[in-house]
């Protein structure tokens, strides 16, 4: 088991659902900022929100006899988000890379993907839905709650965290 680590907040939540029970996110660092978002092709002009997506998902299923496909590298976070917004008529397609290409290679209709600037989405004629922000992410320092219960480990972890904090304050990454 790990005592201390650095990971992207998105990867932490995707890989380890319920991890908050065992790990404390000590702080977010000032680098690696990105957002996990829902994006649709630009030519889907009638789809601006998740509610619009829900509406067309029923039409899509009736017309094509299959559910709307959502390509993603984040199936857990995507499912949790879409279901919380009431979207039910979709199927997750696990992306192995270049997720933004999936709608244009007929592997999915829409995507969820991580983006820092949105430039790659725009370059691939995709746009983020108005309410399509799933998760804000950045690199963060993680601490095992179990390790914090050990006096010696807690002392060492605090020293390390103070050094990291001082270094981050004096010089950007």
Describe the role of every protein-language-model region.
Residues 1-173:
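Domain-level signature for soluble enzymes in the chorismate/prephenate branch of the shikimate pathway
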